[in-house]
Amino acid sequence: MLEKFFKLSENHTDAKTEILAGITTFMTMAYILAVNPSIMAATGMDSGAVFTATALAAFIGTLLMAIFANYPFALAPGMGLNAYFAYTVVIGMGYTWQYALTAVFAEGIIFILLSLTNVREAIFNAIPMNLKSAVSVGIGLFIAFVGLQNAHIVVGGSTLLQLFSVDAYNKANGVEASFNNVGITVILALAGIIITGILVVKNIKGNILWGILITWALGIICQFAGLYVPNADLGFYSLLPDFSKGLSIPSLTPIFGKLQFKGIFSVDFIVILFAFLFVDLFDTIGTLVGVSAKADMLDEEGKLPHIKGALLADAVATTVGAILGTSTTTTFVESASGVSEGGRTGLTAVTTAILFGLSLFLSPIFLAIPSFATAPALVIVGLYMLSNVTNINFTDMSEAIPAYVCIIAMPFFYSISEGISMGVIAYVVLNLITGEAKEKKISALMYVLAILFILKYIFL
């Protein structure tokens, strides 16, 4: 049955590999179950309800990805988009969270229509192959940087970024943490990177997952030994699961279906909606390009088969997520961790979806996994994705320069979509001015995208 539905042999994989890949993807994404409620709670939303909405949106979206496209990609409320929702739209612009949810809902409906009419698929296929490889490399650097940041290995400083020290961390965050709070977690994260690296070199099956679990276990040992001292006020929580509230599922009632359609025809609403549309569109395309390139899923023309199903799953998940009460649900770049473990079909996604469903009942366990334990996974996955740099044609500067711009923009501007925007602009402008555009037969859609991106930077 699994073979027939997921075409395992055709995709050169087996059930064991797919399930392990799905578990790995979930473990690298589980942090969203803790982070999203924390961010959304800043708007006044009930954090328990947001946790339930987050888990359900991830469950439904990832399951739809498996059904519609048979791809090993997982979905959940996106980082960055949730921060824009909370800190810009609600806190910054002064709108209610219900109003912001309505914008997310409208975005989802528009994306469903765009997915059904092939607009999103056309955008995906219009991007040149060298630029697609660059997107994969850029995402690799981006998620490696996110991992280093989550582990506090790099912190803010006088040079913008610097290597960790307790003093630098305290100054950057305006707190008074000690070595037993933050210092030991940095050491554990570094140990985790080394351990995971050793497991990768030894080709141990499930190396990324084992790296997460071993790092977490070392943290628990340090907590028992008194080397790690939890301090909730500073964001350093106990590494032990907290079952004091039992296994009950937090109610969705406070946020379910709370859409506010009054004022949706205002200029502000259109601006908010466009921002959600833009970031989600190109973050999703960037993730699909990067992860599928790493998994060798692109065909000879650089196209991703069944992309319409993948984009439709993403759009429907966003719409459903808004009704449930969470920000934009999108394809997660952490899906690359499962792909690195050999995940190639929707069975990986189904496994991840099931674990998100189970997390509703076992939230204390999943919420106990600290960011320093998942950070090594992100760093190593970044290495895997960086390997696509060999597919970029560096002998042709008209191809190499746009690829370079795309790669460095993602980590430097902390945005996958910005990397794509700048890469597309650089590609079109450079090839147009140097007279290479006609020979390469750059698609009309690439010109349209470049113009739209330039207008975005001018007016937004």
PLM features: residue spans?
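Juxtamembrane transmembrane-helix boundary signature
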Residues: A58-M79, I110
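Helix-loop-helix hairpins and the membrane-proximal interhelical loops
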Residues: M1-A49, I212-I307, I451-I454
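Hydrophobic/aromatic residues within the transmembrane alpha-helices of Major Facilitator Superfamily
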Residues: I23-A30, L63, I67, A144, ...
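Residue-level signature of catalytic and energy-coupling elements of molecular machines
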Residues: I19, I39, I123, G206, ...
